[in-house]
Amino acid sequence: MPISSLVPLTEIRQYCLQLGFSLSDQEIESLRGYLCLLTKWNKVMNLVGFTTWKTICSNLIIDSFHLAIFIRSLSLPTDPLCWDFGSGAGLPGIPLRIIWKEGSYWLVESREKRAIFLKTLLAQYPLTQTYVYCGRVEEFMLANCLSDVALIVSRAFMPWQALLKLIEKKISFKGVIVLLLNDIPKNIDSCWYIQTTYPYSIGGEKRFFVALKKAS
């Protein structure tokens, strides 16, 4: 049985509506492509801890949909350059790019097999100005100019304190860092401040997106 038949378009649309999100026909097609490839590769690579497309949607992809709402509320420049650190299985970046197509978006992943998955996915289901870099974040930052970066996204790349320390040294960075956390961070270094937060709940569990900027 083709794997696409295990992820029906109409069911995806209805399920997304149940979760509170309405997607266009093209977005549903792209989401199905992602779910098909993710569930297929997950059987041999253990990309995510959930095994069915519905549990992947309700526990992981929904974060990306909320992230899109949050990012739209930020005052990003036109055509923003965005970096996604520790992209892994493409979460939150791939579903985010399906529904939020502004600017260019780099998925940075050091683990080769996961980077191959992301490149395979984008070769089969291209997304607007979305690219993959296979290598360490430190190497990626050395090869690119942080002064041009409007947004850095991190879901589970490293502890947020370590990430802020890493970026803190790059004095040219003037953009926003968005973190997915289970609580609003406390005792933030004086080099940073919380610009805004976005709380939401999934299955009774509270989660937060937190936007941070460097203090002047």
Swiss-Prot record:
Major localisation: cytoplasm
Cellular localization per UniProt: Cytoplasm
Superkingdom classification of source: Bacteria
Annotated GO MF terms: rRNA (guanine-N7-)-methyltransferase activity
Binding site for S-adenosyl-L-methionine: 86, 91, 137-138, 155
The enzyme's E.C. designation: 2.1.1.170
Record keywords: Cytoplasm, Methyltransferase, rRNA processing, S-adenosyl-L-methionine, Transferase
Transmembrane region(s): none
Listed InterPro entries: rRNA_ssu_MeTfrase_G, SAM-dependent_MTases_sf
Keyword Heme annotated: no
Reactions accelerated catalytically: guanosine(527) in 16S rRNA + S-adenosyl-L-methionine = N(7)-methylguanosine(527) in 16S rRNA + S-adenosyl-L-homocysteine
GO terms for cellular component: cytosol
Primary role: Specifically methylates the N7 position of guanine in position 527 of 16S rRNA.
UniProt similarity note: Belongs to the methyltransferase superfamily. RNA methyltransferase RsmG family.
HAMAP family to which the protein is assigned, alphabetical: 16SrRNA_methyltr_G
Protein name, entry field: Ribosomal RNA small subunit methyltransferase G
Source species taxonomy: Bacteria, Pseudomonadati, Thermodesulfobacteriota, Desulfovibrionia, Desulfovibrionales
Gene that produces this protein: rsmG
